[in-house]
Amino acid sequence: MAVDMDMPILIVDDYKTMLRIVRNLLKQLGFNNVDEATDGAMALEKSRARQYGLIISDWNMEPMTGYEFLKEVRADTQLKDTPFIMVTAESKTDNVIAAKKAGVNNYIVKPFNAATLKTKLVAVVGDF
């Protein structure tokens, strides 16, 4: 089954530069329906207001981290099946294990490029 290239994607990061980079990488890959949030609390609010086909979130943010946001998403019956990719500079094995246990679908360590993002996207949402 082909991936819906118009599916809404939520990217979450507290750094505007990173939001712009991820948005541009997604655009290079053909995804244009992208929304943004700058912390987990804002992302949770947006996720409850709109059904996203994919969430890509940073780990380290305040006041709600990406990890806390992930746990909230997985605990919410309406959101629990939303594909979720964690993006972070944290490559510690403990963080990867914690994210996997919390239900993350994939994990990307910064810095990354379009090829890395595409590989992770294909693993989560399918080929495009």
Model region roles, listed by residue range:
Residues 23, 68, 91-106:
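Alpha4 helix (beta4-alpha4-beta5 surface) of REC/receiver domains from two-component response regulators
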Residues 61:
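Receiver (REC) domain active-site loop signature in two-component systems and cognate sites
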